[in-house]
Amino acid sequence: MKGLAAALLVLCTVALCSCAQVGTKKEFCCLVYTSRQIPQKFIVDYSETSPQCTKPGVILLSKKRRQICADPNKKWVQKYISDLKLNA
């Protein structure tokens, strides 16, 4: 049951967030942020969006290699980034 709930959460999150590619490099912009906090155990890496984007964002990478756009001003996003930097 927990596995099904986690999978459903990830699928809903992916459906709620969008990324748009900018230019010829693999730079993405977040058009919409995820509305829910993703469990930290699913996040393995992150990247910041390009300064050319109209909206700042953090792209979280899940264990299943899914990209999730998150608001860089949210406390939980800042904590995940800090923890990922410490464990790098």
Swiss-Prot record:
InterPro entries found in the cross-reference section: Chemokine_b/g/d, Chemokine_CC_CS, Chemokine_IL8-like_dom, Interleukin_8-like_sf
BP GO annotations: antimicrobial humoral immune response mediated by antimicrobial peptide; cell chemotaxis; chemokine-mediated signaling pathway; inflammatory response; positive regulation of cell migration
Cellular component GO terms held in the UniProt record: extracellular space
Keyword Acetylation carried by entry: no
Principal subcellular localization: secreted
Entry function: Chemotactic factor that attracts lymphocytes but not monocytes or granulocytes. May be involved in B-cell migration into B-cell follicles in lymph nodes. Attracts naive T-lymphocytes toward dendritic cells and activated macrophages in lymph nodes, has chemotactic activity for naive T-cells, CD4+ and CD8+ T-cells and thus may play a role in both humoral and cell-mediated immunity responses.
Post-translational modification summary for this protein: The Cys-29/Cys-53 disulfide bond is required for activity.
Intracellular or extracellular location(s): Secreted
One example GO MF annotation: CCR chemokine receptor binding
Family per record: Belongs to the intercrine beta (chemokine CC) family.
Disulfide bridge partners, by residue number: C29-C53, C30-C69
Keywords, ordered alphabetically: Chemotaxis, Cytokine, Disulfide bond, Inflammatory response, Secreted, Signal
Protein known as: C-C motif chemokine 18
Xref: Pfam families: IL8
Signal peptide: 1-19
Species the sequence originates in: Macaca mulatta (Rhesus macaque)
Domain of life (superkingdom): Eukaryota
Transmembrane segments: none
